[in-house]
Amino acid sequence: MAEKNAKASIRAKALELGFDAVGFAPTAGSGSAQAGNELRQFLEQGCHGDMAWLGRRIDQRAAPTALWPAARSAIVLGSNYGPGDDPLAILAQPGRAAVSVYAHGRDYHDVVKKRLKSLGRWLASDFDCQLKVFVDTAPLMEKPLAQSAALGWQGKHTNLVSRRLGSWLFLGVVLTTLELEPDQQESDRCGSCRRCLDICPTGAFIAPYRLDARRCISYLTIEHQGHIPAELRPGMGNRVFGCDDCLAVCPWNKFAQASREAAYSARPEITDLSLTELAALDDDAFRTRFRQSPLKRTGRDRLVRNALIGLGNAGDASAMPLIESLLDEPSPVVRAMAVWAARQLLDGAAFASLGENRSAGESDPAVRAEWGWEPDSNVPSPESGEG
């Protein structure tokens, strides 16, 4: 009875602090081995791309007790960031910069971590326990834990799906020395549905529940540091930071609710951003504009790279003066995508004229390949692992 009362008190406190979902999971077993094996397979197939850090401390990722042997229970918290409107509508406006819903407001790490620390202080005071808090910053696999804690299940798109809140949940975890009875694990409710798989514009899903990050727009626009493979650029459309397609089409979103968290509210300087405005940012303007935003993690050069791909896909030749000004950028990834965007917007003769007198001054193989001065093999494919 005391344990049940403890769980009820913890749940009530977490909701009071602003969390939208609370569950309790064991720290050993309950899918840990399976999650670890799936991660190893993902890594062995090279599907992680540039994310070499995923291969470090795999045993700790797979089992919370390997990360912290004293842990007896995991309290898994969900923070709803559901959008108030259709996140896919912006894709029909090719001149605008499409940013993933999770980055429309303040950086969620700051919001969730502050609440986790508040919950942790209360737990330590009221229950005399030890604990550690995590929000996407340690080798801990939050989604399998969230499924074990009955917050939802990992859908065919590999993200968590909640019966009550759909696909829009940020996750945080408290590992504690408290012995708390686990909640009953949520079962998979995807059935025969494959909407998330079929909508992917770059074919990133190898199979249901299996993602090749090297083809995923979220990975390419946020994590990938090099040149984006040419065959994947058209599918990016105007997406410059992340992609919500597979999340947004999930039928379980009919139960989703718009977030009540003010910090996640859409900021006009992010949601009303044009591709030309984004591509024109210098480093100082980038840092000022995105100071408290997740967009800051890409750095200015990669975000401009993404915007140039969007401009090439948009087909609006009025962007050419801006694109031409970026042909002499210090960053090779910016120069290369400026060349690619120009090729999309100009006829052959105009493109050739633009490249006159530039060959001698360009040494980067990938940029030269975009001009057509080097073999196309210099532009990496998603399977090559280069770039």
Show where each model-derived region lies.
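Iron-sulfur cluster-binding cysteine motifs and their immediate structural context
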Residues: F19, R195-Y219, R239-A263, L322
